[in-house]
Curated annotation (Swiss-Prot):
It comes from Vibrio parahaemolyticus serotype O3:K6 (strain RIMD 2210633). This is Probable transcriptional regulatory protein VPA0011. GO terms for cellular component: cytosol. GO terms for molecular function: DNA binding. One of its GO terms (biological process) is regulation of DNA-templated transcription. Gene3D superfamilies: 1.10.10.200, 3.30.70.980. It comes from the Bacteria. The keyword Flavoprotein does not apply. Pfam families: TACO1_YebC_N, Transcrip_reg. InterPro entries: Integrase-like_N, TACO1_YebC-like_2nd/3rd_dom, TACO1_YebC_N, Transcrip_reg_TACO1-like, Transcrip_reg_TACO1-like_dom3, YebC-like. It is found in: Cytoplasm. Belongs to the TACO1 family. Keywords: Cytoplasm, DNA-binding, Transcription, Transcription regulation. Transmembrane segments: none annotated.
């Protein structure tokens, strides 16, 4: 069948693996969110947002339904959140969020990702103070002043509103996520929000190039291969 088929098959396998990783990640998050706060999205706003985000990322309905059914059944694994911090290649700062049913295993898996690229895992608080825990919304627009005034009128504690190349980005404390989203949807019902998430925003970025850039990409790939890793935040400027 030739070399081209082998390359295509490898590419398809990689794509399939990436999809399975995304489905697994959302399955865990939806299961835990429904188990802790109830499986009715109308009564559990965090779950409602998570399901909407999963659908936007093209997670199949059966994956979502299976996670909800599992939560309703009352059994299943008890995943707990785990957060690890450390220093990545090139002097970067990294936060790794996990959901795990075995903390010791997950710690060792994440630690090995650091070790394999000559990086160092740190203690709690070692780098998180260099990030702001923010709600971030991004959408197309030209008038950032109107957005800022609207949110302030609704008593949203806005951190910043940026306009760049026809894209508006709103930053607010992570505790203001639903208040910000509700205010935007109420004031601009036809607005399409392209990004809506709670994330860690680095206060400063660290330029990474050459060998350090290669190591950093390898580091991200290693973390992506860890089943328990849900999110990776960093300040690398690649």
């Amino acid at each position: 069948m030739g070399r081209s088929f082998e390359v295509r098959k490898a590419s398809m396998a990689k794509t399939a693996g990436a999809k399975i990783k995304v489905y697994s990640k959302y399955g865990k998050e939806i299961y835990m969110c429904a188990k802790n706060g109830g499986s009715d999205p109308d009564m559990n706003l965090s779950l409602k947002h998570l399901i909407a985000k999963a659908k936007k990322d093209q997670v199949p309905a059966h994956v979502i339904e299976k996670a909800l059914d599992k939560a309703n059944g009352g059994g299943g694994e008890d995943y707990v959140p785990a957060r690890y911090e450390g220093f990545g290649p090139g002097g970067t700062s990294v936060i790794v969020d996990c959901l795990t049913d075995n903390g010791n295993r997950t710690f060792q898996d994440v630690r090995q990702c650091f070790v394999k690229v000559g990086a160092k895992i740190g203690v709690e608080g070692s780098v998180s103070h260099m990030f702001d825990h923010q709600a971030v919304f991004q959408f197309k627009g030209e008038d950032d002043e109107v957005i800022l005034e609207t949110l302030m009128m609704e008593d949203v504690d806005v951190t910043d509103v940026e306009l760049e190349d026809g894209v508006i980005t709103v930053f607010a404390p992570h505790t203001e996520f639903f208040k910000t989203k509700t205010a935007l949807n109420a004031a601009f019902p036809d607005l399409t929000i392209d990004v809506e998430e709670i994330t860690f925003v680095p206060q400063t970025q660290t330029p990474v190039a050459g060998e350090d850039a290669e190591k950093f990409q390898k580091f991200l790939d290693l973390l992506d291969d860890c089943d328990d890793v849900q999110q990776v935040y960093h300040n690398a400027e690649l």
